[in-house]
Each structure stands twice: as structure tokens, then as C-alpha cells.
Swiss-Prot record:
One of its GO terms (molecular function) is DNA-directed RNA polymerase activity. DNA-dependent RNA polymerase catalyzes the transcription of DNA into RNA using the four ribonucleoside triphosphates as substrates. Residues 265-335 are annotated as: Alpha C-terminal domain (alpha-CTD). It comes from Coffea arabica (Arabian coffee). Keywords: Chloroplast, DNA-directed RNA polymerase, Nucleotidyltransferase, Plastid, Transcription, Transferase. InterPro entries: DNA-dir_RNA_pol_insert, DNA-dir_RNA_pol_RpoA/D/Rpb3, DNA-dir_RpoA, RBP11-like, RNAP_asu_C, RNApol_insert_sf. This is DNA-directed RNA polymerase subunit alpha. The keyword Chaperone does not apply. In plastids the minimal PEP RNA polymerase catalytic core is composed of four subunits: alpha, beta, beta', and beta''. When a (nuclear-encoded) sigma factor is associated with the core the holoenzyme is formed, which can initiate transcription. It is found in: Plastid, Chloroplast. The N-terminal domain is essential for RNAP assembly and basal transcription, whereas the C-terminal domain is involved in interaction with transcriptional regulators and with upstream promoter elements. SUPFAM superfamilies: C-terminal domain of RNA polymerase alpha subunit, Insert subdomain of RNA polymerase alpha subunit, RBP11-like subunits of RNA polymerase.
Length: 335
């Protein structure tokens, strides 16, 4: 085994990329180091970063397939080499790169004989395929294969259940995670009480994003989780009267929204959807999952209601207010 010489900073804490490679269209690898760290810090950061990489980054997958000619998932179609189940498993493996919010539709319509691959999928412009050569099916005879697909951007897993089945529609167990694996190791250096640590972080992705992009997204997600702690009032930071909560710094969302609500009659808020606003993807997805689709829906929610949304923070509420004020000015009729 050849020892690798790596130069690390002895003063300023910094990330450094020491290796990047593309093993295939669907397998990227990156290795990074963070140093110098005090004893124990590397393990803290390594655990948090690995969990954020594997659980917090969104990916895009096919989640449902519909075809009128299919009797059930385990049937076969005359003239096609693969069974319906095998075709579904092949579609499950297709890797997408997208700026998709929520779900969208796609389709395949080809005529045999010949091979059906990922490049035969007709997609909206904001979704693209990472590897066009991925195999889907082989048509042995001059027959038509037409299927409709539902594509979704999400995080984690989506396991199909009996309630998910619809007529002629077959859900697919989706693995949205674009990170194939993430590992970290810790190396110590120095003597005595001056021992320091280097954190090595390895990231494998499915090709829909690079290891550098994955590291950036995971870091951003972790920062978002800790932002509320930075806005606590210093004078209220200790627990008083046996209270077990620490109040956030006051942000008078309601007062500002009242001024905006006065303009309701002048603006068709019902017809202005939140995807027309300049909302960041994470905020948009959080609102949509809470059935907030229009600016009217948004204005009818209090700060307290918004803060109850999963993964929502006070900074998100402030950002929404800024965008709302800008948006309402844009849509106000000129006098």
C-alpha cells in the first residue's frame, strides 16, 4: 500500500478536495479533508455530515407507471422479452437530474423490433437523464409499447403500499437518495496536549450531482437546522420560572402581513401560485407539502402555523415576507 502525502493547514480550518473521479456515468467519487480540528470535533462533524448526505439531499425518480395493456405487475406482454415486473425494475434504476418541484409526467412510445432505452423517455425540459443507455426493454416483434410515467423529486425512500395502486397504474418503490455511499475516517497528528485531527470524507454519487455539489447541499442543510439557535435573545437565553423553552427573537410577521392583507381586494391572490414567486426550492417544497399553493393560502397562515411545518425555520419566514412584499408590489395595479 502506497502512503499518500497530503498537505493540511495548521492554522485556518478549511475543506480541501484531494480526489475527484468519474468511474462511470452513474458513479462519481470524491474525497475531501477538513483540518485542523480539535480532538472530538472530527467525529461530531463526520457523523452529522454523513447523515445529512444520506438522508437530506433530494433526488429524482420514477414513482409510477401506467399502461392500459397490462393486466397486473407480474404479467407478460406478447412480443416483449422482459416481464412487466422486470420493466418496472429497469425503470426504477433510471437516474435523473432535475430542477423539478414535486411531480411531473413523462412518457415512452416506441415501435419494435428493437431495444428501448432511457433515451426513449419523453421528458419536460427541466428533467434530464444522466445515462441515456440504461436498458428498459427489448421488443422482439413489430409492436407498440406506450407507457406513461410519473416522476417525483423527493428525499429518502418511497415504499409502495396497496392503497397506492390505481387502475392500470403501478407504483414503484423509489430510492430518491442520490448519494450511493458516504464514509468518514479520522487521523490524529501532533504531540501531547497539542494533538489535532484531520477528517477524511468520502462521497459516492449516482451521477445526478457531483460529490462537491453533494457536500455543499449537505452543509447548507445542516446550517439551516442550526440557524434558529443564532437568533435567540441573549437576555432570554437562561431558563426562568422552571420554563423549559427558550423564546426566539421576536419577529412580527403578523404585523407586516396585516399591511399586505389590506391589499387583498386589489389583488387576485387566489390566482397567484407560489411557484410564480422566487421561492427557494426547499421552501417551495415545504409549503406544497402543507397544501399551500397560492399567495392567498400563504397569507391565511400565521407565523406560528408556518413554523410548525417540518424543516421550516424563522429565516424561511423572513425570506417569504421579503418575497411577498416584492411580489405584491409587482402585481398591484397601477393607478
Amino acid at each position: 500500500m502506497v502512503r499518500e502525502k497530503i498537505t493540511v493547514s495548521t492554522r485556518t480550518l478549511e475543506w480541501k478536495c484531494v480526489e475527484l473521479r468519474t468511474d462511470s456515468k452513474r458513479l462519481y467519487y470524491g474525497r475531501f479533508i477538513l483540518s485542523p480540528l480539535m480532538k472530538g470535533q472530527a467525529d461530531t462533524i463526520g457523523i452529522a455530515m454523513r447523515r445529512a448526505l444520506l438522508g437530506e439531499i433530494e433526488g429524482t425518480c420514477i414513482t409510477r407507471v401506467k399502461s392500459e395493456k397490462v393486466a397486473h405487475e407480474y404479467s407478460t406482454i406478447a412480443g416483449i422479452q422482459e416481464s412487466v415486473h422486470e420493466i418496472l425494475m429497469n425503470l426504477k434504476e433510471i437516474v435523473f437530474r432535475s430542477n423539478l418541484y414535486g411531480t411531473c409526467d413523462a412518457s415512452i412510445c416506441v415501435r419494435g423490433p428493437g431495444y428501448v432505452t432511457a433515451q426513449d423517455i419523453v421528458l419536460p425540459p427541466y428533467v434530464e437523464i444522466v445515462d441515456n443507455t440504461q436498458h428498459i426493454a427489448r421488443l422482439m416483434e413489430p409492436i407498440n409499447l406506450c407507457i406513461r410515467l410519473e416522476i417525483e423529486r423527493n428525499r429518502g425512500y418511497l415504499i409502495k403500499t396497496p392503497q397506492n395502486f390505481q387502475d392500470g397504474s403501478y407504483p414503484i418503490d423509489a430510492v430518491f437518495m442520490p448519494i450511493r455511499n458516504a464514509n468518514y475516517s479520522i487521523h490524529s497528528y501532533g504531540n501531547g496536549n497539542e494533538k489535532q485531527e484531520i477528517l477524511f470524507l468520502e462521497i459516492w454519487t449516482n451521477g445526478s450531482l457531483t460529490p462537491k455539489e453533494a457536500l455543499h447541499q449537505a452543509s447548507r442543510n445542516l446550517i439551516d437546522l442550526f440557524i434558529p439557535f443564532l437568533h435567540m435573545e441573549e437576555q432570554n437565553s437562561h431558563l426562568e420560572n422552571n420554563q423549559h423553552t427558550v423564546p426566539l427573537a421576536p419577529f412580527f410577521f403578523h404585523d407586516k402581513l396585516d399591511k399586505l392583507r389590506k391589499n387583498k381586494k386589489e389583488i387576485a391572490l387566489k390566482s397567484i401560485f407560489i411557484d410564480q414567486s422566487e421561492l427557494p426550492p426547499r421552501i417551495y417544497n415545504c409549503l406544497k407539502r402543507s397544501n399551500i399553493y397560492t399567495l392567498l393560502d400563504l397569507l391565511n397562515n400565521s407565523q406560528e402555523n408556518l413554523m410548525k411545518i417540518e424543516h421550516f425555520h424563522i429565516e424561511d419566514v423572513k425570506e417569504i415576507l421579503g418575497i411577498l412584499e416584492k411580489q405584491l408590489v409587482i402585481f398591484l395595479p397601477k393607478k
